[in-house]
Amino acid sequence: MRNLLHHAIVIIGGGPAGLAAAVCAKKNGVDDILIIERDTKLGGILNQCIHNGFGLHTFKEELTGPEYAQRFIDQAEELSINYWLDTMVIHISEDKMITAVNGERGLCHIKADSIILAMGCRERPRGALNIPGYRPAGIYNAGTAQRLVNIEGYMPGKEVVILGSGDIGLIMARRLTLEGAKVKLVAELMPYSGGLKRNIVQCLDDYDIPLRLSHTVVDIQGRERVEGVTIAQVDEHLCPIPGTEETYSCDTLLLSVGLIPENELSEKMDISLNKKTNGPLVNECLETSIEGVFACGNVLMYTILLTLFLRKPVLPENMQHSI
């Protein structure tokens, strides 16, 4: 087979979990490590999280997302850990043969003794919400809007309604306000917020942004561009209550309605998945149903506290035996 390579450990994903796993493996005596990252730089989602609040547990100081990611990148480079950027893994076989492609190397086949899945998670799209209305411009996932503002330098809109009170949505409510947009409200389907209390206070209360619990978007107005949204209160069965509709004019709707693990590779490998989280089922050593294949970070399940996963052991004893 052309371009056949071999590595002791291959880590799919160069975000904080993948970097932490690589550093841990290197410090435990594994020298032959390869990180494969599909983006143009390491760091994962943290590169667009320019707010502070990271690093208190791991580094004992408050850092922004990029600063936090850079700490792990620096450790990986100091340990001479090999990594490929701008590389997409398109298939992994049950015998741990990885097929990847990038512009420099073309199609590559990599045989790994052990694999760590650290692909992270993705946002739940509008299609999963069954919101009536047309499909005008101006509807974004909160993470997409975060990247547009923080990395690309674009404002998604001037008048914004946010559906969902996850932490990304709360943080973007503050960010857009600081950039000059008017955030009309944050609507949350559940009778409680999905974000941290700290973020509710710092991102909504401090800027007088209303949080409407037990409310959801039932209609989107506009054909070419969002012109307004209609929200309604929901009952205990999460069904809209007739007569409670309210319409708000806006040009942008942000969706912050949950994150789901990137599980396409896991499904192709026939790894057993957790029906509640859609991430791989793992044992106490974070090993999946396939021997020698491990998973860590948000690919298991989304957690609002990054340090919960970074503090877990990512190089258990049976992984050391497998390599």
What role is predicted for each listed range?
Residues 1-323:
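Residues forming the flavin
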